[in-house]
Amino acid sequence: MAKRVLILATDGFEQSELLEPRKLLEAAGFETTLASPTPGTIRGWHDGDWGKPIKVDKDIEDVSADDFDALLLPGGQMNPDILRMDDRVIELIEDFDSENKPIGAICHAPWLLIEADIVDGRTVTGWPSIHTDLENAGAEVVDQAVAIDGNLITSRKPEDIPAFAQALIDALEEAEEEDEDDAEEEDDGIEEL
């Protein structure tokens, strides 16, 4: 069964930070689902103006970390700023983290990780204007394309998308291999009659 990635976004996401990683994840064989507290469609930000509407697959009320293998949080200034005020979003992020499932956050999306209180003592990156916020929340901030600390995969900006998406793909493939190894171990323990 293909690994499933939940994407959380609302109006004002950076269009490339949702569409490009989604395309790369799907090309690698993973299923994606876009959830939002905003029903119907949401609009991203593209080249200084509103982008095209994107269809929302599920309402945030209808998703659970139990149903997905990873979480993708696109940035943009408005999107994470709106989402971090929604307790349902923060609870979902906390659930992914407590289950040690990969969480990818790019650009301003690490604001959501701060709100979920999961960056203290961890190495992360993000858009330069939120570095102080991350440091004040106890994170060690690095200025590099991708920072990986346990299940957290963070990135700075749209130019980093290829490396960011690949890190998320690698984490999902590693989880698939672990699942296969666990299944083989269970099969080895079955006695034949």
Model-derived regions: residue spans:
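Extended, subdomain-level signal for the structured scaffold at the beginning of enzyme domains
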Residues: 1-99, 103, 112-118, 123, ...
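Catalytic nucleophile serine of serine hydrolases
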Residues: 107
